[in-house]
Structures are given as structure tokens and as C-alpha cells.
Amino acid sequence: MRKLTTILLLALAALSCQTEKQNPWNEDWDKPDQPDKPQPVATAKPRYVWIDAAANFDDYGNSRDRIREDCKRIAQTGFTDIIVDVRPTTGDVLFTSSVAPALKRIDRWKGSSYEWTERTADFDYLQAFIEDGHAAGLKVHAAMNTMVGGYLCPYGLGKEGMVYSDSSKKEWCTVQNRPEGLVNCLDIDEYGARFLNPAHKDVQAFVISLVAELAAYKELDGIVLDRCRYDDSGLMSDFSETTRKAFEQFCGHSVSPWPSAIFSPGTESLGSAVSSLQREWLTFRVKTIHDLVEKAAAKAHEVNPKIRFGTYVGAWYSSYYTSGVNWASPSYNCKTEYLWASADYQAAGYADHLDYIFLGAYAGADYIHGTTEWTMEGFCKLGAKRLASAVPFAAGPDIGNSSGFPEGGKGSLMPDIVKTCIGNADGLFIFDLCHIKMYDYWSSLKTGIDAYLKTVNNQ
């Protein structure tokens, strides 16, 4: 018994003499258990659908019920956001404004010709979409055609918009360097939108005022500038005296003869050689748009710090210089790829001033896959390269107007389109809602979106 007691005492003594490291296999034995680090949760990318004002006006211009019903269906299909056009190409508006006229009518294609559709309702069009979109679980963004002020309509419908109703606004309009000479766009008899001059200080102030009015809608989720560019005549615009003075100040010398020192009459795109003055001219145009976008973004955030601000652009960057827009990141070295670009042109990339951007990947129905422009996949991949992570972007096709789409019957392509575009961008963008409805693409788009969401949930 005494021997057993001695052994026990020796064992206790040995334990008492151990170091503080009681459990050498676990140094932190005496510390509280730490919870496992949470694994990052996969977040689904946003899915946007555009709602063009003119194309959808018969449904929504005078019917709050249809707005409510279709917002629900859009959400049920799997879209997360709607982009509502509230300033179509006439330049009149579908929101509360003290600086732009309210839209009273719009020309609509009615089977065999264009006809006027009158707005008889008095509800706030934008506010209706905000309320009904949010009720359906959608985020709501307002888009406006920025550099437009009127429209010359076909089929004898005549003229519409503030540049036609207010004669003082003619000086706001672009002057084109046409084959017959310098012509104000209001004096041209070709059908289409009439563009405002981005270099005109009064035009810039007008645009900023419109942005401020949109931002004043406190529940609005975002503002998207569409057609924030020079007009559809390519490099023929703008050669007004206002622009001449601004350009000469920009480059620091007089330009004579005007405008042939830059381009001969009727020039719409560049040739194989580009002069130093032409590079300065192209840089001046993109810098003009850059500065306007920067000011508009600042105004939107000043009025409403929570609102997002962005633009829609065509993804065809290689020829978008004709529109006077450099939507890329200023870190994208465009001057090594394009002979028309300079270091100053590169610096005028405006992507870093945006909260988001929408790229029209408007390839034809037979060109979903590829690595180049004019394929949807190529547009997305090149867009990512050019934006260089400066801003998140959504991309997608025009499913009603691009080659192969106008005939409809492309529902079988929608799942692949969704997979391709959302897989190579930060979000999906579909133009336009009217085409989804016209060709009944609801279920095929839902199939594609559901398949995408399944991959997110399995991560």
C-alpha cells in the first residue's frame, strides 16, 4: 500500500512540474474556440431589360395596370432590373420636368405605316414604373436620350420636339459638314432624330438640369444616359461656329480653312492615314463628351448620393470614334491598337466616372460565339478588356433589330445568349421588352436565366 501511495505522489508531482504548455499537440488549448471563417456566398449577376418609350408606348403610355402586370412578369422571368426610357428621340419627357416639354404624342409603327399615339393619361410615367417595379421586386433605372431635341417623322407625320417648336433652339443643333457644305441639321429633310451640339454650353447646362430632375426621384435606383454622343452622321458633325471656337481654344491655334482643314465635305469616317489635326479633332470630341459625363455624374450624386449613374454605348469600340465617345477606362492603351488614338484620346476615357455601363452587344442571331467584334461573346470579352475593371458592365443583344432577329422565332437561342453574355460580363442586358412580348420569348429567357442561377447556387 505504501509503495502504491508513493507512486501516486510521484505522478502528481510530475504533473505539477509540467510547463504551461499543458497540451503540446494544441498550443491554443486554453483559448476560446474560434468559429470557422465564413465561406464567400456566390452572388448572382444582375439581369436588365430595356423598355423603349416609343416601342412600348401603346402598352404603357396610358395604362398603369399594364405597367403593374408586366413588371410582375418581368420579375417572374428572372430579370432583376428594368431600364425605363423616359426621354425618347423627340426630346420630350415622361417625367416631371421644368426644363423640358412633356411628351404629348409619339409616332408608332402600326402594321403598314407610322401613326401618332396620343398621351391622354396624367399619371407620372416614371413614378409609376418606380412604384410598380419596386412592388414586383425589381430595381428601376431611368434612361434618357441625351443629345436629341426633336424628330422628323416619316409617312408625312411631320416634326416633333422642342427644336422645332422653339425657334431659338436652332443654334443648339448640330451643323453637318455635308457634301453640299455646312448645313444645320434642322434644314435637312432626312427622317430621324435631330441632335444637339455637345460643345454648346447651353446644351450642357440643359442636360445637367435634366439629370438633376431625374436624380430628384429619391426612390429611383439609377440614371442611364443613352445617345450621349454626336449625331448619326459620323464625322460630318459638328462644325458649328460654337464648336469652331471651342476647338481652337482646345488646340491653341486657329483652324483655317474651316472645316476642310480637318475633313473635306461629306467625310463620314477616316481613311488609311490620319493627320495630327484630325487626331486633335477626335480627341476634342471625346474630351467634350467625357467632361459632360463627368459633370452629369457629379450632379446626379450631389442631388441623390444613393443613385447609380451610367451610360449605354455600342460595344463596337473600333468604330465608335465616329460618335465622339471613348467609353473605355483611361488605363486601356487604345493608342497602341488604333491609328486615330493618341495619349490624350486615351486619357479621355470616361469609364472611371460611372457606377455601371451597358454595352450593346448587337451581333446577329448567327453570331453568338467568337472573339471579335460583331459576335456577342467577342463584344463582351473585348468590352471587359477595354473597361479594365474600372466599372461593372452588363452586355447583351438587340433581339428585335439585329440581323436574323426581326423575323422572330429565335427562342431556342435565348438560353445560349443568356449563358454567353452573362458569363463574359458583369450582368445581362436585353433590348428590348417589346421584342420579348412580340415574339413570346418569356419562357426561353426564363430557361436561360434559371440555368444560370442554378450554376450560382451550386458554387
Feature-to-residue mapping (PLM):
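Substrate-binding cleft of secreted/luminal carbohydrate-active enzymes
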Residues: 342-459
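Bacterial Sec-dependent N-terminal signal peptides
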Residues: 14-43
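Aromatic- and acidic-residue-enriched segments that line the glycan-binding/catalytic groove
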Residues: 94-107, 148-189, 227-269, 322-333
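Substrate-binding cleft/loops of secretory-pathway carbohydrate-active enzymes
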Residues: 149-152, 156-157, 233, 303, ...
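Glycine-rich, aromatic-flanked loop segments that form ligand/cofactor-binding clefts
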Residues: 79-90, 125-187, 224-227, 305-310
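Aromatic-lined carbohydrate-binding/catalytic grooves of carbohydrate-active enzymes
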Residues: 79-121
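Active-site-adjacent "subsite" loops/lids of carbohydrate-active enzymes
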Residues: 40-61, 142-217, 267-278
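Catalytic domains of carbohydrate-active enzymes, especially glycoside hydrolases
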Residues: 65-92, 217-220, 346-359, 424-428
